[in-house]
Amino acid sequence: MRRLRRVLLWTLFGLYCALMLWLLLFRRLGRTMPGEYAALLHTNCNLTPLRTIRSYLLVLRRSSSPTMRRYAVVNLAGNIGMFVPLGVLPPLLWPRLRRLPRLLLSAAAVIAAVEAVQLFTLLGSCDVDDLLLNLLGVLLGWGLLRLFSRGRDAVN
């Protein structure tokens, strides 16, 4: 039974990684706009913490446009929700990642690498707020794992 559980967890993790690579990078291949890299970088990069989050919260508070409100919700919830599995699966697969600081540091490294690829390839946008929201998703996943795990030995 333990072997079946591990195979299932590895399969889920592999599928999750493949889906994330497609969503974050590969679905945008061939869709980058032609133009000067510096100009595109200016519009596709935010290195000011909380700038994007504040703008989405402002849209939710003040906009009467259902489309704009939906876009803000999808972006905020999506950036959090997409990374909940990263707070669940790695701690189940690697005991060393069951401690929150180690998990968050590992997740931050992975997310920063994805953001760097997006920055240099212009496949998507590089946004420090994505890193913050993604880490919030990892934290939420880890908390849910702790909440629903059976026994103290499942997750330290």
Residue ranges and their predicted role:
Residues M1-L123, W142-N156:
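Bulky hydrophobic segments
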Residues N134-L144:
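C-terminal or internal capping secondary-structure element at the end of a domain, subdomain, or sheet
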